[in-house]
From Swiss-Prot:
Lineage: Bacteria, Pseudomonadati, Pseudomonadota, Alphaproteobacteria, Hyphomicrobiales
Annotated protein name in UniProt: UPF0434 protein RPD_0454
Matching PANTHER family: PROTEIN PREY, MITOCHONDRIAL, ZGC:162634
Alphabetical list of Pfam families matching this protein: Trm112p (PF03966)
InterPro entries the UniProt entry points to: Trm112-like
Any one Gene Ontology cellular component term annotated for this protein: cytosol
Organism field: Rhodopseudomonas palustris (strain BisB5)
Family assignment from sequence similarity: Belongs to the UPF0434 family.
Amino acid sequence: MTTSSERPETSVDRKLLEILVCPVTKGPLEFDAARQELISRGAKLAYPIRDGIPIMLPEEARKLG
């Protein structure tokens, strides 16, 4: 059961995910539903999704270990 304080898990449209690529490597992205991020394994960056909009700016991305 979801309470009003919990944010329901959203998903990224499959077609959008097929179109979007990492702006650094031009490689594919993976959707992380728990963190609401698009992951670029090649660039080791996680691009945030805010209000359903992917923020595809390298300076906004979280660096992965």
